Swiss-Prot record:
The chain crosses the membrane at residues 102-122, 124-144, 150-170, 201-221, 223-243, 275-295, 306-326, 347-367, 393-413, 430-450, 458-478, 497-517. This is Proton/sulfate cotransporter 2. Residues 704-718 have a biased composition (Low complexity). Keywords: Cell membrane, Membrane, Stress response, Sulfate transport, Symport, Transmembrane, Transmembrane helix, Transport. It is a multi-pass membrane protein.
Length: 764
């Protein structure tokens, strides 16, 4: 009995990774005891989708097993690390890390203070809310987050989403030009309600984050492709930049979020531009870009990058205190509330606008989650440690919960600040903790100073910060690689620019899902031919030299079969069968066999199975037998339950296309048909949705000579008894014999390869 070392499903649960391989008897796909073979089991990793009927039970058993393991082996420190992840890096903290973490924390603190003030203004909130968002959420994340370099706080895209959507919910807020000083008791009440909506949104986002993390639903971000997010962030970057140009120009205009409206408003109000703010704003913008570029290009001056925003803030404050520019046409922020944030739990409920807030919370959570996890994974990979994805999501949720409790709007990981944190040498979450207390120091002692900061400074900081969000290089790459992905990118980009932020994102996600549905509903199918001189069967569209055999049609389906694509597959198969029938008759041979290559097919649903039965019956009515090649054990089990396996017949299921063709050609030869391969030049064209370019054959021996005798075998040795080959003699076959029992392939054989096999090589 030959030992089979292939991975054949036993229907059981995979062995633990630390288990040793074991040997046992299994049955092949036919269920025949005479084909019972011995195999070596291998401990493969568990896949909860492998047995869907047992997945829920298996997951629950895994939870119980993990719990029992922890109870049996964990000490109090392990339990503390389980609930507070910062204990993991505290247990291995080195003294050499301390200086790096302090430098990184202070550097990011210098960066986040002016950015926080700017982003809060972009969100339509008082400037101090940006500092609140960089304080307590940062502390909480440093304790419960799993990334050691991620810098948490307010970000530009989220601020834009809030400023856009909340003003749709509360239109009265559009009339407030300075959230720090609304200007009247009525506007004060409107601003307070606006602030309350922002806190309620943060609470909903925190709930979504925590739920996604606890129930391990992080896969939902897979529906936001890189094309969707790239186009979204690029469009949002332009929208953000244009919304801040008014501060650099010194123009007082209402906020507009659509490109055409912004352009019209600027053109109509350009005569109101103040040259003082324009000169100061453009000077600050030049300095910020200069500091950033020099810091990125030179390791010697990398310290310039994080201090750029703080530097222009200091220059602006000096101009106010020394030059008294606020009385010369320069607008300043105004009053900023001093001290640490006060609790706002009472603002959570009642929530009458929940029907409008909840969809926005979903969008904000998805965008923030993708942005944060992508940079966290990149940093973990770069610093060679493991990122716990679900713990990361829970950590962000708890950070937002803390923010919602203490007057903060939604926060997430920042690309720019996280990059600076990593470049500054941050080793652990202590750097994030130090950043929070830099912000806390500003809140307690320096808010009166920042109240005199010119608005053009904040505008310049935001414009310089969003330059990195413009992913035009990604659009060029997608155009070269995949036009459909480029279309999704452009839909997201143009939708955000010309319609609105949330609608543009929705259009892009919808288009991406439609493309996935289209690709799934119209999968690639192929007419397969043999490469001359080999036992390799390939798509004749890609390999024009591949040869076909009259009377034998080999059809490959490159996708799972289910209700959405089975009609397309049926039409393609019927078209190929009709064309092949005519072509075979021209060679004096009827279409005897249709061989379905199921190697790419991983799943068949009930509709697909029923339609396959119809196809088998239809072909049988034309005198054509359906043959299966290389179906998986799961597909065979499904066909058994549905009755399709018995309808086809166990004698017509093979482990390879080559074996199926050899068997069918032998049967046809026994019936008196001379089966000889021919090239595809005379084959009738049958169009395909995809027509890839021709590829070179995978063999240097590309001739059309009659094949010579050699057996296809995993060991490279021919079998003692063989089926007849295409175009060759038909030796007598007494029965099925085991593979690999003698002979060897001679390199001096005639050109070409005879397709021979043994019965024992059928589907096991």
């Amino acid at each position: 009995m030959k030992r089979n070392t292939s991975n054949v499903d036993t229907g059981g649960v995979p062995a633990p990774l630390n288990s040793t391989p074991s040997t046992r008897l299994i049955q092949n796909g036919y269920g025949d005891s005479k084909y019972e073979t011995e195999r070596m089991e291998f401990p493969f990793p568990e896949d909860p989708r492998y047995h869907p009927r047992d997945s829920v039970k298996g997951a629950w058993e895994k939870v119980k097993e993990d719990h029992h393991h922890r109870v049996a082996t964990y000490n109090w420190v392990d339990w503390l690390a389980f609930f507070i992840p910062c204990v993991r890096w505290l247990r291995t903290y080195r003294r050499s890390y301390l200086l790096n973490d302090i430098v990184a924390g202070i550097s990011v603190g210098f960066m986040v203070v002016p950015q926080g003030l700017s982003y809060a203004n972009l969100a339509g909130l008082p400037s101090v809310y940006g500092l609140y968002g960089a304080f307590l959420p940062c502390i909480v994340y440093s304790l419960v987050g799993s990334s050691r370099q991620l810098a948490v706080g307010p970000v530009a895209v989220t601020s834009l989403l809030l400023g856009t959507k909340l003003k749709d919910i509360l239109p009265e807020a559009a009339g407030i030009s300075n959230p720090n000083i609304p200007g009247s008791p009525e506007l004060d009440a409107v601003q307070e309600k606006y602030n309350r909506l922002a806190i309620q949104l943060a609470f909903l986002v925190a709930c979504l984050y925590t739920g996604v993390g606890i129930f391990r639903l992080g896969f939902v971000t897979n529906f936001l492709s890189h094309a969707v997010i790239g186009g979204f962030t690029s469009g949002a970057a332009i929208t953000i930049g244009l919304s801040q140009v008014k501060y650099i120009l010194g123009i007082s205009i209402p906020r507009q979020d659509r490109l055409q409206d912004q352009a019209k408003t600027y053109v109509d109000n350009m005569h109101n531009m103040k040259w003082q703010e324009f000169i100061m704003g453009t000077t600050f913008l030049f300095l910020l870009v200069l500091f950033k570029e020099v810091g990125k290009r030179s390791k010697r001056f990398k310290w310039l990058r994080p201090i750029g925003p703080l530097t222009v803030c200091i220059i602006g404050l000096c101009a106010v205190y020394v030059g008294n520019v606020q009385n010369k046409g320069i607008k300043i922020i105004g009053a900023i509330k001093a001290g640490l944030p006060a609790p706002t739990v009472s603002w959570w409920f009642p929530m009458p606008e929940i029907s409008q807030l909840f969809p926005t919370a979903i969008v904000v959570m998805l965008v923030d989650l993708l942005e944060s996890t992508s940079i966290a994974r990149a940093l973990a990979r770069k610093n060679k440690y493991e990122l716990h994805a679900n713990q990361e999501i829970v950590g962000l949720g708890l950070a937002n919960f803390a923010g919602a409790i203490f007057n903060c709007y939604t926060t997430t990981g920042s690309f720019s600040r996280s990059a600076v944190n990593n470049e500054s040498g941050a080793k652990t979450g202590l750097a994030c903790f130090i950043t929070a207390w830099v912000v806390g120091f500003v809140l307690i002692f320096l808010t009166p100073v920042f109240a005199h900061l010119p608005y053009c400074t904040l505008g310049a900081i935001i414009v310089s910060s969003i330059v990195g969000l413009l992913e035009y290089e990604q659009a060029i790459y997608l155009w070269k690689v995949n036009k459909l992905d480029w279309l999704v990118w452009m839909a997201s980009f143009l939708g955000v620019l010309f319609i609105s932020v949330e609608i543009g994102l929705g259009i892009a996600i919808g288009l991406a899902i439609l493309i996935v549905i289209y690709e799934s509903a119209f999968p690639n199918t192929a007419l397969v031919g043999r490469i001359p001189g080999t036992t390799i069967w390939r798509n004749i569209k890609q390999y024009p030299n591949a040869q076909l055999a009259p009377g034998l049609l080999v059809f490959r389906i490159d996708a799972p079969i289910y209700f959405a694509n089975i009609q397309w597959i049926k039409e393609r198969l019927e078209g190929f069968a009709s064309a092949h029938r005519v072509w075979s008759q021209e060679h004096g041979v009827p279409l005897e066999y249709v061989i379905l290559d199921f190697s790419p097919v991983t799943h068949i649903d009930a509709t697909g199975l029923h339609t396959l039965e119809t196809i088998v019956e239809t072909l049988a009515g034309h005198g054509t037998q359906v043959v299966l090649a290389n179906p998986s054990q799961e597909i065979i089990a499904l066909m058994r339950r549905g009755g399709l396996f018995d309808m086809i017949g166990r004698d017509y299921v093979f482990i390879t296309v080559n074996e199926a063709v050899t068997f069918c050609s032998r049967q046809m030869a026994e019936r008196g048909y001379a089966v000889k391969e021919d090239n595809t030049s005379s084959y009738p064209h049958f169009g395909s949705r995809r027509t890839p370019g021709a590829l070179p054959a995978p063999s240097s021996q590309l001739d059309s000579s009659p094949p010579t005798s050699v057996t296809e075998s995993t060991s490279g040795t021919p079998a003692a008894g063989t089926y007849s080959s295409i175009g060759g003699a038909v030796p007598a076959v007494a029965g099925h014999t085991a593979a690999g029992n003698g002979g060897s392939h001679s390199p001096s054989a005639q050109p070409g390869v005879q397709l021979t096999t043994t019965g024992s090589q059928r589907q096991q």
